[in-house]
Amino acid sequence: MSEYIRVTEDESDEPIEIPSEDDGTVLLSTVTAQFPGACGLRYRNPVSQCMRGVRLVEGILHAPDAGWGNLVYVVNYPKDNKRKMDETDASSAVKVKRAVQKTSDLIVLGLPWKTTEQDLKEYFSTFGEVLMVQVKKDLKTGHSKGFGFVRFTEYETQVKVMSQRHMIDGRWCDCKLPNSKQSQDEPLRSRKVFVGRCTEDMTEDELREFFSQYGDVMDVFIPKPFRAFAFVTFADDQIAQSLCGEDLIIKGISVHISNAEPKHNSNRQLERSGRFGGNPGGFGNQGGFGNSRGGGAGLGNNQGSNMGGGMNFGAFSINPAMMAAAQAALQSSWGMMGMLASQQNQSGPSGNNQNQGNMQREPNQAFGSGNNSYSGSNSGAAIGWGSASNAGSGSGFNGGFGSSMDSKSSGWGM
């Protein structure tokens, strides 16, 4: 005659009644039907309070000597399965914990001066439950500083708010994580893309409809006045990143998609690369004001590589043609340019005196340094540029600056 025995996964859980066979045994398959992965049963001895195992023979569980009774039997699992279950539970707990940690204060930038904390709370309450709002004010005047903070209860609400722009009291505002909350090692991947080469007949609705084929579009923004580009924000950052670098056809026009990098990231890159060009040292190619051998002071006049007689000011290249154009412009403004240019008989040679730049100079003595040459006198000074490797190129040039101490006049001569 069959009977029901009480089986549970843990002693603290509510047991389940499982039927036995007519001979009083219980099939292991009956147990695994309710507890997948089970491999046996155990119970606590009422006398010794120790756990005892139930005898298992060829998939059949045999009752203890005193019968099944009213005892509660606990399911046994293989150690590997139990370890996997524990790891799964721990992983789930960590995921839940991380999700809770991600919910944090959001900074709201670009607030109108008239916006109050109550206005801010009423606006963001349309997205979800708001835990806190704050408008930062000046301690002395009590006026708004133009930004504030907001915190939501649900992380999903936070993501939704961050993925779009907000019109608050007639002004567009941005809502994002403060810089201090963002990990420098794992920066947040942007969900916003830059759409270049747009035309004026493209509307926000048309762009939204086009990009919706790739994923959920949270926001479309076309700057006013029109500047031939737009921004599209997706709900999924992976979709946004997958489109970066692509050329797409919208209304018969090819548009280019790239990452919408924040302004502060671009500024940091400029700071890392230096102010004038990619090399440290301001003007020039190797620090200081130039790198001419022999103690010269040319502004980035790279010796040995200036085959065409041009000059390189860091990231700016100036060739003889440009210098000639500058000369023409100066001559139209300075009446004495022609006179000073004709008096350049004391200009130093534009030659190969690479070792004379460090020599002791007497008044009226000309000297040269690599691609640079100089001459000095009691009444004036001239600076000339030339190229030691200009032979046959016809692209060398000389320039000088003359200064008359007597007439108190100055000018450029080329």
Swiss-Prot record:
Organism: Pongo abelii
Name of the coding gene: TARDBP
Protein known as: TAR DNA-binding protein 43
One Gene Ontology biological process: regulation of circadian rhythm
Modified residues (Omega-N-methylarginine): R293
Biased composition (Gly residues): 275-303
Modified residues (Phosphoserine): S183, S292
Predominant subcellular localization, coarse grouping: nucleus
InterPro entries: Nucleotide-bd_a/b_plait_sf (IPR012677), RBD_domain_sf (IPR035979), RRM_dom (IPR000504), TDP-43_C (IPR049124), TDP-43_N (IPR041105)
PANTHER family to which the protein is assigned, alphabetical: RNA-BINDING (RRM/RBD/RNP MOTIFS) FAMILY PROTEIN, TAR DNA-BINDING PROTEIN 43
